[in-house]
Amino acid sequence: MAARVCCQLDPARDVLCLRPVGAESRGRPVSGPFGPLPSPSSSAVPADHGAHLSLRGLPVCAFSSAEPCALRLTSARRMETTVNAHQVLPKVLHKRTLGLSAMSTTDLEAYFKDCLFKDWEELGEEIRLKVWRL
């Protein structure tokens, strides 16, 4: 079964955060191929929107002023392989940072639901960790 997440744009940092719906923060940060990324500042994230850290492998958006925005998506089952995706999402996030018109948050939600979770849960795609880095 696919994880339930909501996409939220944090205007203070201009990053897209994916949060587990109705979940408490019990997860652990996931280390990707670029090393561990710091979690976003909790002061910019309202408490009632759930965790910003990975919860049993749910998506994470990590940001640091010293690093590019990295959106890491993992399936709940395993995280053995990595791919740098050459898809539309990095371009969309880059446009947001430049103040250009880009995909709406609703469209991004549909992108994750239709593309990523469908690949993992319905098609059984074996790549379990996707990393985009701007």
Swiss-Prot record:
Keywords: Activation of host NF-kappa-B by virus, Activator, Apoptosis, Host cytoplasm, Host G2/M cell cycle arrest by virus, Host mitochondrion, Host nucleus, Host-virus interaction, Modulation of host cell cycle by virus, Transcription, Transcription regulation
Region (Disordered): 25-48
Source species, domain of life: Viruses
PTM notes: A fraction may be phosphorylated in insect cells and HepG2 cells, a human hepatoblastoma cell line. Phosphorylated in vitro by host protein kinase C or mitogen-activated protein kinase. N-acetylated in insect cells.
GO cellular-component term (any): host cell mitochondrion
Subcellular location as annotated: Host cytoplasm; Host nucleus; Host mitochondrion
One of the Pfam families matching this protein, by short name: X
Region of interest: Mitochondrial targeting sequence: 68-117
Cross-referenced InterPro entries: Transactivation_prot_X
Family under the similarity heading: Belongs to the orthohepadnavirus protein X family.
HAMAP family: HBV_X
Role according to the record: Multifunctional protein that plays a role in silencing host antiviral defenses and promoting viral transcription. Does not seem to be essential for HBV infection. May be directly involved in development of cirrhosis and liver cancer (hepatocellular carcinoma). Most of cytosolic activities involve modulation of cytosolic calcium. The effect on apoptosis is controversial depending on the cell types in which the studies have been conducted. May induce apoptosis by localizing in mitochondria and causing loss of mitochondrial membrane potential.
Subunit details: May form homodimer. May interact with host CEBPA, CFLAR, CREB1, DDB1, E4F1, HBXIP, HSPD1/HSP60, NFKBIA, POLR2E and SMAD4. Interacts with host SMC5-SMC6 complex and induces its degradation. Interacts with host TRPC4AP; leading to prevent ubiquitination of TRPC4AP. Interacts with host PLSCR1; this interaction promotes ubiquitination and degradation of HBx and impairs HBx-mediated cell proliferation.
Protein's name according to its UniProt entry: Protein X
Native source organism of the sequence: Hepatitis B virus genotype C subtype adr (isolate Japan/A4/1994) (HBV-C)
Name of the coding gene: X
